[in-house]
Amino acid sequence: MPEVGLSVFLRIGPFVHGEVRNGGFPDWIIEREKEGMAIRCNNEEYLGYVRRFWKKVYAQVDGCMEKDGGPVIGIQIENEYGHVGGLQGPEGEAHIRTLTAMAKEIGFDVPLYTATGWGGAASAICFRSWAATVKHHGSENVRD
């Protein structure tokens, strides 16, 4: 993407939602959940699968981080955690912190964030965050 000037926000999940099948989880993870494996929490077995997946993702984007001159400027951890599945409160916060530490350890060295617009989300105190107040009046600036 550097050749066309596009920046990338990479969504590594492990749950990405995006209105895709199983929120992006492979069928076999859902089968393991049905067999009793807890997902989207600090279950060691689940975290092992996340680590293995993220290492494979990182192998494909190694050298593509902004610090390396690449287009990846941010990485989304999880999605709608605490609203569409996941834990709330201290357990949810602990899980988001675990995922964040794992991503950094693997080498995802760009700003990390998560996305949710719902109350009860565990992420609010887990990331340094910012908010912008945007004046939006319908189609006012569409032609600019």
Question: What do the predicted segments below correspond to?
Answer:
Residues M1-D109:
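Active-site mouth of glycoside hydrolases
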Residues G89-D144:
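Noncatalytic carbohydrate-binding groove/subsite architecture in carbohydrate-active enzymes
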